[in-house]
């Protein structure tokens, strides 16, 4: 039963609009709530983001009552607690708040305070004849199915995924080599069963778009009213001897079994590990394995890791962080081949570079990019794939030229309207983007005719320190402005094209990325000239109007 809990050292609800306070709850060990004032009304919510637990008092609060996590871009509506943007899945809790007798109280239960969240409840029985069929089992699927049920959809929802398990936190595969399904899964299977969501282990083979049916490799056929394609990406093998899947202990990293196989090969650690590719997957898994006391070398083609995306100066910061963790680098390098071990010719023993360098290897991990997983659509006369194998969509992620079909995540090329985008087609391989696209499609299905809600792409990475990034450089960038102390890996990097800031990256500077994303949504981000004159984006007020 709900009761009143007194807030420590709070005597009134006198606050300014936009103000946030994290306060302790008397009599509840570890109990905290967040007080916020929006549009002359004080709200009381749980104090931490439901994604990874970031303190929301350090987040960004907008005039209309949107609270954004300082770490990974999750957004909540402070009036309802509902999730507005990925990657959070559960809402924040809302508490009734009262002021009386010179003190302030929240009305709730002790269990609710300790939970520090509101657990999403989407239990229902399918009662309508509509059928949404989702192909894929990743982040986009997660956003779509939870968004559908959370938005009131009562039709049948079926998910076809070849992975054989419910949606997992795929970001932790490379960041932490998480290989336990009980820890990696966002929800237990019962959660989806209670929501009348059928998850089937199978793989799409072909689609009859006119007949609205999907055929699978097991020989079954599924019909649909609406189809959501969320099949993600397929990691690439290098087409080189020993590196195209033809030697043992050479791995890709995309699935839970991939992580399990890498850990099995690593064994008790102390192994020589060669990582081919100095982009995010390679850097993250290399850093993780070095932390486990393995001898790790990362091979990259550029002068600095992630130079094309992040710029040379920022890439050098990342390299320095990993070198402190014991990682070695071979940059500006080209791989020639991998050769077998002298002890076991079925397994890798070395990686050869084109300059003649040979790196000993007990195992090799390739992180050289992914291709859109759309093999089941090749040769289908009803659809035209882009050159990279993706599907072109409109702003609502509806596939061009098809009725009642949506594409999200790694396989979708959609018009980008963020700064510097101007509607240019872009394909973004970010966890947040896929999940937000799934949420957007769910909203469109639940509310036919509604306009899609725009979002700014966000990603993060674990590189010895936590990287945050928002925006996109689809149109390129011509300068990187670094502020802070880059030598201490504490900085904000502004990626500019002309006067426009098209992307922002930060380390140890929360919540600059979050603030930048909100400024971008409202088209009031500082210009390059303003930044050069010393404008601090944390001091720029957020207008009510969203202009994306």
Q: Where do the model's predicted regions map?
A:
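Mid-to-C-terminal Rossmann-like scaffold of FAD/NAD(P)H-dependent oxidoreductases
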Residues: 131-132, 411-514, 518
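FAD-binding core/adjacent interface of flavoenzyme oxidoreductases
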Residues: 55-56, 70-71, 75-103, 107-133, ...
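Short, well-ordered coil/turn residues at beta-beta hairpins
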Residues: 51-52, 58, 230-231, 331, ...
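FAD-site-proximal beta/loop scaffold in flavoenzymes
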Residues: 245-269, 350-352, 357-437, 530-535
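A Rossmann-like FAD-binding core segment of flavoenzymes
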Residues: 28-30, 154, 158, 195-215, ...
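C-terminal catalytic lobe of FAD-dependent flavoproteins
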Residues: 45, 349, 355-385, 465-546
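N-terminal pre-ligand scaffold of iron-sulfur
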Residues: 1-62, 98-109
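Beta1-alpha1 glycine-rich phosphate/pyrophosphate-binding loop at the start
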Residues: 127-198, 280, 287-313, 515
């Amino acid at each position: 039963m709900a009761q009143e809990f007194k807030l420590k050292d709070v005597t009134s609800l006198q606050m300014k609009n936009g103000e946030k306070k994290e306060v302790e709850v008397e009599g509840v060990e570890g109990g905290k709530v967040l007080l916020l004032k929006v549009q002359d009304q004080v709200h009381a919510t749980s104090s931490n983001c439901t994604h990874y637990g970031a303190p929301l008092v350090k987040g960004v609060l907008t005039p209309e009552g949107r609270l954004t996590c300082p770490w990974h871009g999750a957004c909540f509506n402070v009036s309802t607690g509902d999730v507005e943007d990925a990657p959070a899945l559960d809402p924040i809790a809302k508490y009734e708040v009262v002021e009386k007798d010179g003190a302030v109280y929240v009305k709730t239960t002790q269990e609710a305070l300790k939970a520090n969240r509101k657990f999403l409840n989407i239990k229902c029985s399918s009662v309508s004849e509509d059928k949404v069929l989702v192909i894929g089992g990743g982040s986009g699927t997660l956003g779509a199915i939870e968004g559908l049920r959370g938005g009131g959809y009562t039709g049948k929802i079926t998910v076809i995924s070849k992975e054989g398990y419910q949606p997992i936190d795929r970001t932790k595969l490379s960041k932490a080599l998480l290989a336990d399904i009980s820890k990696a899964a966002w929800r237990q299977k019962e959660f989806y069963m209670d929501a009348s969501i059928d998850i089937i282990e199978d793989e799409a083979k072909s689609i009859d778009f006119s007949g609205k049916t999907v055929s699978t490799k097991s020989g079954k056929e599924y019909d649909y009213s609406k189809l959501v394609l969320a099949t993600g990406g397929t990691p690439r093998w290098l087409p080189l001897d020993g590196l195209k899947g033809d030697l043992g202990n050479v791995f890709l990293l995309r699935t839970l079994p991939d992580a399990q196989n890498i850990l099995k090969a690593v064994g008790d650690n102390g192994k020589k590990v060669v990582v081919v590719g100095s982009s995010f997957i390679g850097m993250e898994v290399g850093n993780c394995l070095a932390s486990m006391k393995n001898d790790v070398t990362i091979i990259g083609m550029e002068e600095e890791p992630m130079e094309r995306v992040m710029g040379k100066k920022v890439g050098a910061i990342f390299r320095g962080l990993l070198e402190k963790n014991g990682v070695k680098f071979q940059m500006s390098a080209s791989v020639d081949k991998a050769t077998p071990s002298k002890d076991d010719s079925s397994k890798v023993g070395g990686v050869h570079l084109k300059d003649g360098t040979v790196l000993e290897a007990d195992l090799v991990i390739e992180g050289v990019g992914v291709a859109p997983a759309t093999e089941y659509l090749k040769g289908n006369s009803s659809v035209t794939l882009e050159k990279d194998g993706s599907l072109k969509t409109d702003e609502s992620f509806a596939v061009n030229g098809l009725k009642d079909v949506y594409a999200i995540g790694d396989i979708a090329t959609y018009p980008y309207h963020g700064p510097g985008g101007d509607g240019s087609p872009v394909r973004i391989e970010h966890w947040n983007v896929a999940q937000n696209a799934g949420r957007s499609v769910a909203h469109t299905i639940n509310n036919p005719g509604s306009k899609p809600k725009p979002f700014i792409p966000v990603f993060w990475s674990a590189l010895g320190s936590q990287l945050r990034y928002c925006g996109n450089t689809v149109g390129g960038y011509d300068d990187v402005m670094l502020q802070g102390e880059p030598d201490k890996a504490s900085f904000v990097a502004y990626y500019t094209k002309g006067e426009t800031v098209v992307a922002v990256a930060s380390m140890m500077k929360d919540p600059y990325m979050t603030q930048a994303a909100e400024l971008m949504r409202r088209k009031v981000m500082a210009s390059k000239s303003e930044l050069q004159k010393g404008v601090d984006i944390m001091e720029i007020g957020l207008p009510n109007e969203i202009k994306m």
